[in-house]
């Protein structure tokens, strides 16, 4: 695994768990609001973490940690992801995956083999706005739709989440996304933070006020029973 970053202990990234967070490099999207530009655009310039150091840490922390979060970048691009997760599971640790959902084949394999306990999938926009919000004019949004369907049909815990960027996503867009993921376990609206964005122009954009986000929650709740706001 090409590991590029590491938060050794987190109480907030994996609901209900004390976890370590591992960051992979590389991504197939170019989302303008992304805060991990180095991992997305220049992963080769970020030094690899020694994998043996991670395994030694997990062994030492046995009984204290109970989860591992694999995030990015986009973890499903890593060819060693599945065997890596198998090794984590062999340590009796729970696994949370953060993903953009563009590799439904990898997600299906992880779900089918019971290798993940929680998936947080970013749903960037309504289907018609996906090319704009991901920076990919030729994006195949059906692949994202397949991942949405896989999670809705699974028996693990999961959430869909959207970073709400003013000028790019409005109330009607959030309602359309909620309709797209209708019946999901959980949908989270994430507050946009105008810092270190992949597109520096967005650093001049003020986030939505909290009351605006909660109005979006109200509208999304028509389609998803549990809707939350994060980051306000």
Residue ranges and their predicted role:
Residues 3-6, 52, 98-100:
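Short gly/ser/thr-rich secondary-structure transition/capping motifs
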Residues 37-68:
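Conserved alpha-helical substructure of the radical SAM core
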Residues 55-67, 76-216:
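Conserved AdoMet/S-adenosylmethionine-binding subsite of the radical SAM
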